[in-house]
Amino acid sequence: MNGTEGNNFYVPLSNRTGLVRSPFEYPQYYLAEPWQFKLLAVYMFFLICLGLPINGLTLICTAQHKKLRQPLNFILVNLAVAGAIMVCFGFTVTFYTAINGYFALGPTGCAVEGFMATLGGEVALWSLVVLAIERYIVVCKPMGSFKFSSTHASAGIAFTWVMAMACAAPPLVGWSRYIPEGIQCSCGPDYYTLNPEYNNESYVLYMFICHFILPVTIIFFTYGRLVCTVKAAAAQQQDSASTQKAEREVTKMVILMVLGFLVAWTPYATVAAWIFFNKGAAFSAQFMAIPAFFSKTSALYNPVIYVLLNKQFRSCMLTTLFCGKNPLGDEESSTVSTSKTEVSSVSPA
């Protein structure tokens, strides 16, 4: 065995070294140099300083500007809420524990932090799925002239929270558990042990299939169809500047959406899968820590991709930041409704 399993923890170092101590009681400087913990604290502070204002500004703008409270924008607000949860309940805890060099909040704090971080991440993930389905329905029109209402948008948001809870809650009630991971400063599901008391294997398989593979499949299918539909419409209307513009905007958004998701979560999922299928194999604490902390950046660039590239949100944000005046002038605002109509009115060939 190349790791040490204890009460609610697993340290990726054999206790034959005599160095292993509980990550809830002692600094873990035998896993990584003290400067690495300080670097992690600086990194988390950076994410907090950027993530909280960006996500908070999205929520403030939506509250201030009535025109943003449209059904197709509800899911973007949900993304901001998910990002704020990750920042407030995940990043701040990791910042504190990194400064201390160990998970100083104990097993209960670990369970709460792991739950909130997983919940926020899963709400964001399923929000992307709902966003993909919404745009597929609006652009590809598989159900004909479907009017997307507030009821549909609210149902989509409720769905994201139900799916997120279905992933994040089981470890709190005995199906798997939340334990410190990486350099023991943040918590996540137990991919590491075969403890039959917690049925870790069945939970991890459920999580990978239902909360990673399934969402990825849906996202790729819906956006693949969306791009094909827009390209087909543009090919039939080659002289239409508006259709060409719609094609460019939608294609750019699709590429950024898919890349953003894969860049954030694929390294973490890949490493977790490797650890799960290679129980007992030797690996360093940094091997899991780096992708785990890198995935947290999704809370930062999600609003950049899904909100700041939305002309309507961008215009309102600038108006809010500059006390009611848009420094870019009226041109930015005037193109909002036109662009929205262009992308939404593309019909299948």
UniProtKB/Swiss-Prot annotation:
UniProt cross-references to InterPro entries, sorted A to Z: GPCR_opsins, GPCR_Rhodpsn, GPCR_Rhodpsn_7TM, Opsin, Retinal_BS, Rhodopsin, Rhodopsin_N
Localization per Swiss-Prot or TrEMBL: Membrane
GO terms, molecular function: G protein-coupled receptor activity; photoreceptor activity
SUPFAM superfamilies xrefs: Family A G protein-coupled receptor-like
Glycan attachment points: N2, N15
Main location: membrane
Extracellular side: 1-36, 100-113, 177-202, 277-284
Tissues where this protein is expressed: The color pigments are found in the cone photoreceptor cells.
Annotated positions of the N6-(retinylidene)lysine modification: K296
PTM (free text): Phosphorylated on some or all of the serine and threonine residues present in the C-terminal region.
Disordered as annotated region, ranges: 329-349
Feature: compositional bias, Low complexity: 334-349
Function noted in UniProt: Visual pigments are the light-absorbing molecules that mediate vision. They consist of an apoprotein, opsin, covalently linked to cis-retinal.
Name this protein carries in UniProt: Green-sensitive opsin-2
Species annotation: Carassius auratus (Goldfish)
